[in-house]
Structure formats: C-alpha cells, structure tokens
C-alpha cells in the first residue's frame, strides 16, 4: 500500500467517524427533546442543521475517490463547523446573559421555514426559547457542549488536511 493510499484511507475513516458522531449528537438532542421534554429553540435547530451538514459532507467526502474530492468536502465540513460555532457561541452567550434573547419572534419563522422543518417537524421545528436553562451535563450547558464539538471539528479537520498533505506521496 502506498503512502497516498494509507493517508487517504485514514482520512476517510476519520470522516466516517465524524459523520457518525454528528448523527449521534442529533440523536441525543432528539432524545432530550422527546423523552426529557426539552424544547429546542431557534439556535438549537440551527446547531442541528450544522451537525447534519457536517455529517452529510463527511460521508460524501469519505465516499470520494482521490485527494481533491476528499479535500473539497473536508472544506465544506469545516465551513459547516464554523456556522455551528456561530450558532452555538451565540446560544452560549445568551445563556450566560439571560437578559438578551435570541429573538424567537425573529428567528422562529425563518428556521421553521427551512425545508426540514416541514419534512421532519419533530426534529427541526422551533418550540422553545433560547434563554431556557436546562440542567448542565458534566458541568456544561448543551450549547457549550455543542460549541466544543464545533470548535474541535473546525480545528481537527483542517489539521488533518494539512498533516496528510505534508506527507510525501
């Protein structure tokens, strides 16, 4: 096996793992919504979209042949993670400053107008407020956990690209 094949396979395995983790996080959010009754706010839904796009781009990238195709989808994964950072960062800031709201009246119609809100309303339709504090998980709010996941993705995926492109082929 050549070095090119080895590093490309390792990168593809990483993308598949990332996609599975993102889908698991969406599943966890749905569990908390349905089983625990924690209603999602507009920023929660935007974070779900970011996770979904990361998973989709990661799976497509893992299925691509050749370095260039994989790199394009890794760039899309990184872009989706940056969008997730914006949504989760704003949500974490709102939770830290409850006097400010995410503006459910402003964001709700926009988020509810997105295609998945009509196709899968249970998972992608707004039903809560961004200022609602839910019990922390291991000391962090859900928004802080999401922010951590998005930041790690935005750092690790480009690091993987850079590391594997420096290898001699």
Curated annotation (Swiss-Prot):
One of its GO terms (molecular function) is protein-disulfide reductase activity. Gene3D superfamilies: DsbB-like (1.20.1550.10). Residues 1-14, 65-71, 164-169 are cytoplasmic. Residues 32-49, 90-144 are periplasmic. It is found in: Cell inner membrane. It is a multi-pass membrane protein. This is Disulfide bond formation protein B. The lineage of its organism: Bacteria, Pseudomonadati, Pseudomonadota, Gammaproteobacteria, Pseudomonadales. The gene is dsbB.
